[in-house]
Amino acid sequence: MATKAIDVSTHNGNIDFNKVKAAGVENVIIRCGFTGYGRSHTLNKDARFEENYKKAKEAGLNVGAYYFSVALTEADALREAAFVLSLLKGKQFELPIYYDVEDVHDTSAAGVLPQNMQGLSKAQLTAIVNRFCDTVEKAGYFVGIYSGKYWFRDEMDMSVLNRYTVWLAHWTTQTDYTGPYGLWQYTDSGKIDGVQGNVDMSYLYQDFAPIIKRLGLNGFTASETPSAPVILMGDVNGDGAVTEYDALLTLRRSAGLETFTEAQNKAADMDGDGKITAADAREILRKSAGPED
C-alpha cells in the first residue's frame, strides 16, 4: 500500500512537521544541498536542512535527503558526493539518499555555466550519475536517483543504473512510465497542512525503513535480529511477497553489495545454478509484476 511523501527545501519556509504528520503524510525527503549554476560551481548546504531534519525526526516522520546536482564531469560528481557525505554525517535516514538529476539551466545567462546536464551525452550523464551514486553507496547509504520520466527514458542508460532505486517525477494523475520505481512524485502543487503554499507530493511504494535499518545503512546500526525464514522463491527479505525490492536486493547481492543468509541465497537463486546473478534479479522482477497475460 502506498504512503504519502513530501519533499522540501528552504523554499518551503518554516514547516510544522507535526501538522504534516497529522495530515496523513508519513515520509519527507529534505534537500540537504545543491550545486550553484555559477561558473565557480559552488557547493551549497540548504539553509534549512538542519532545522528541517531535526523537526521532521521529532515529529516521527520517515526522513530521506536529496542533493540537486549540476555535475558536468565525473570529477564534479565525486566532489558533490564528498560534500553530501559531510552533510549526512551523524544523522540517520529511514529513506534513501537521492541524487537530483534535472539540470536545464539557461546557458546563455550571464555568469552561469556554459553547459547544463541536459547537454551531455547519455554515456556521459550515466557515468556521472553512477559515479556519485556508487561513491555514496559504498559509504554505507541506500542511494536513489530523482529525475523526470523523459530523463530516465531518454537521457540515462538505466541498464547501467538499475541497481539504484528510482524516484520518478511525472506530474500527472497516472504515470505511463514503464520502468521500476519506488517513489512517484505526482505533483509540484500539492497542499498539505503545515506547509505554506504549494509543496511537491509523492507516493512511496517501497517500505525502505525496515530494510535500511536491518542492513545498518544510512547511519543505523545493523539489526542483530535474525532474518525471518524465507519460504517463497524470490521473497528475499522474507516479508511473504515477491516485490521489486526483492529484485533490487538480489541485484545488489550479484554486485557484491549485499551479504545474504543461506535462506536468502536459496530464495534469490531463481535458476538454481548456485549463483546469484543479474538474471536472477530480472526473474524476480518479472515475478513481482504478477502472472503474464
Language-model segments: residues:
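Substrate-binding cleft of extracellular glycoside hydrolase catalytic domains
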Residues: 1-139
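Hydrophobic anchor at the start of a short beta-strand
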Residues: 63, 142-144, 166
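Sec/Tat-exported extracytoplasmic proteins
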Residues: 24, 32, 57-60, 88, ...
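Aromatic-lined carbohydrate-recognition surfaces of secreted/lumenal glycan-active proteins
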Residues: 136-154
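Functionally critical loop-and-helix segments that line ligand-binding/catalytic clefts
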Residues: 1-12, 22, 157-228
